[in-house]
Amino acid sequence: MRYFLLVVMILSVCMKSFSQTKITGRVADKDGHAMEGFVTLNIPGESNILSFADIDDEGMYALDYNGSADSICIRVSGFQIGNYSKVVANRSQTLNFMVEVKGINLKEVDVKADPVTIKGDTTDYLVSSYQQQGDRVIGDVLKRVPGVEVSKSGEITYNGKAISKFYVEEMDMLQGRYGLAVNNITADAVSKVQVMEHHQPVKMLQGMGRTDEVAINLKLKEKAKGTYVLATALGAGISERQGKGVRGLWNEELVGMYFGKERQTMQTYKGNNSGDDILAELSNQYGSAGLAPVSRVHASGPGTPGVPQKRYMDNQTHALSHNWLERLDKDKEMVFNAVYSHDFQNREGYTYTEWYRPEADAVRLHESQFSTNRSHSLDLSHRYTDNSSRHYTSNALSAHVSWNDDRVDGQIWSQNYNSIVIQRMRSTPLRFYDKFIIQRRMGDNVLRFNVFGGYAQSSQKLRVVEHEDSCRMQELMPRTISLGAFTSYIKQFRHVRGEYGFNGRSAIYGEEGMLMGHADLNAEDCRNRMWYGIYRVSVFQDYTYMYKRGDIKLGLPVALDAQSSNDMVRHNRHVFFRPIIQPSLSVSYDWKVYNTLQGKLHFEQQVGDFNSLFHGYVMEDYRTVLRSQVKDMFTRKNINVSGNYQHSNALRQFFFNANAGYSHTWRNQIDALVYDGIYSTSIIHELHNGSSSVFTGIGMSKNFSWKKCYVKLNVGYSHNEYQRLIDGNMMSCSGNLGRINVAGSITPLRWIGLVASFGGMVSRTSCGRSVSDMVKDYMGRISLKLCPIEQLTLNVSAEGTYDNWNAKNHYRYFSDAGIQYSFRKVSLELEGNNLLNQKKYVMNRNDNMDMYHLEYALRPRNVLLKVRFNVL
């Protein structure tokens, strides 16, 4: 520990020793009146802006510069004053400007706003600079904003970092379901996209050290404020059937929204059977409440291919949401969110699997399956927040209930097995959770108090019928109860902030279940009825040293765990006590103006795991049963080291990030697989084992004003080493994975747009002396947009995929087309999908030396016509 603290002190002294130039001054006219504008700093003879500041209401400005240049150029600019500059020595000083007001004849001036402006940690992107013909919603524009990425799941990242908050007019109505805003607020309604780095949503903590969070705020145009908008879309079409004939398609939308100063609302209904994934926008990208019942049981059905869901999803889906925010005063607000969905899906596919065995031939299995999945889901949440400069109070209550019914009919065959297998799985998850937070600021210090509690359960039943005289059934009811309280005190010592706290929590897990129909197993071994409790008391102290260009953080939490287990079937009771220490260290440094370096070191411990304590058999799916044979508590220790470099130059619209990391894990338990024909038993044994991983990645994006061009690149590589226990043989295994994604866009002429993308993945694994074949998957897509007139937009796209595993058909091709025509306030959209009528998609995967070959039925060729218009 002495050496650890010595390193921290040396780093602190080194960071503080970097010299810094501070330029301050006032900008005024000859009469002393403050003028509006901004001030920049650059090296004489160079165009790169190294520092930037706005002139405040008093005419004052302040610039910071870290560099070794002998001289620097300070430039003042403004709409009414023109440009003024001075070259001065590189030293801290006061530099005032006396400027002259210049009259401007607006009729003779073409005023064009800059696409990017920066004020402190906030970067404004002018939507009109990135919007193109045919862009309907703000999500279409976000994909072109420099540094912004929108993943397939809907998650938004900025220069490789996931956003932590999404606001509309500085209000978070959607509470993480920001896909509703991205996919429904029209692009014409948004003026600017604001990216806020080092974002601190709690006002009383602002100025007490910077965070590593990123947030996005949509600034609306005046015409979009204070007006209720109700928009609808009605769609109908036809699709070929897998056999013969055609079937009808429908696609409906109704969206209402209101954005005012004191109130925001959004109501949505969407439904279709045309393959559109309308549930993705309802996902909470902030994460769930952190409380969920244990789920061990599922029906094994066709997997999902690596193509957009619209290509394969045979669905009937309905989704409704109601979102409401009321601002009670400038600090207080209430938010209510309700989401309901009903989803019915058919899936059809064929899977060939080879399970690796070190001392025997691989287990080979063919599965031809058809599944139907039905679900109903309801989510309710309410949040009250009082967020002022002196105190913060928040209470968040959430509830979730769903009903799921899955049926899988399949023909299963292997070397010595051939049978019809019917699986029926039903589950009803239920969850309630509440979290209360109160914080008070006392001078430069802060007192915090949090309390939370929740309950979750899930009734699960899996029924498997094989042949005509064989029926197995697994019933399971897991429950979770969680309670906790947390309090801390933050003390500010000039450049050092210390946080000292106490944390107490308890989590109680219960499970009751029975496996029926296994005549070869003892009846008592097929029952589970147990309770498991974790009771933790911890104290912690966190220190943050803050300097002008970054900070150093040191965390020293210490905890004592008391854990108890009670197996009421086997009459076994155990109590364990374990100390836990989890120190962490992180360093952040802003290098020059646009560069940030970060390093993190973290040691973690986990003691106890409910999933390792059940001693009765549980049928996971029709092929696999699970069981634990351990007596001691599960223990896991993990050390993580990572580094990150970010370059963010919004003015030049260039972003780059690189990261690398290493992780090593020690465990005292391992899952052992034992095969018996196509069936397997997974047994948890007490056996020390370890795993390690190395990863590295690079991301880059660059926008050009020339031809509205942009280029994006993401490259990554990971290497993993781990151990497996199969049929009593302990093996050392490793896996390598490389990936690349490239995308670009260009508009060579006003009426032509071209977008191209390419993605690829290469993987290989090994266990013992066995090495798998290389698995390669590539996908490329090119889209052409034509805009012959302002009201008409034509889109044509072609897509190709390749894999090296299927010798008969390496390549697959797809083509789609669309026409959009707008007149007055009505928009007509005609789309055709899978015009080449591909019947199936082939995908291959290598996982722990197990090989998976998937053939999945795709949606046949289809055409859909949609009419959009505003009701209000």
Placement of each model-derived feature along the sequence:
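Membrane-proximal, glycine/serine-rich, low-complexity loop/turn segments characteristic
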Residues: S19-K22, R26, K30, E58-M60, ...
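Outer-membrane beta-barrel translocator domains and adjoining extracellular loop/strand segments
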Residues: Q206-G207, G243, Y269, I278-N284, ...
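Structural signature of Gram-negative outer-membrane beta-barrels, strongest in the C-terminal barrel
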Residues: R448-A456, P478-E512, H518-T665, S783-K785, ...
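Short, acidic Ser/Thr/Gly-rich low-complexity loop/linker segments typical of extracellular
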Residues: E46-M60
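A short, solvent-exposed loop/turn motif at the edges and junctions
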Residues: N42-N48, C73-K86
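Outer membrane beta-barrel strand-and-loop segments of large Gram-negative receptors
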Residues: E524-M530, S538, S628, F634, ...
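Short, ordered, surface-exposed loop/turn motifs in non-cytosolic proteins
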Residues: D29-G45
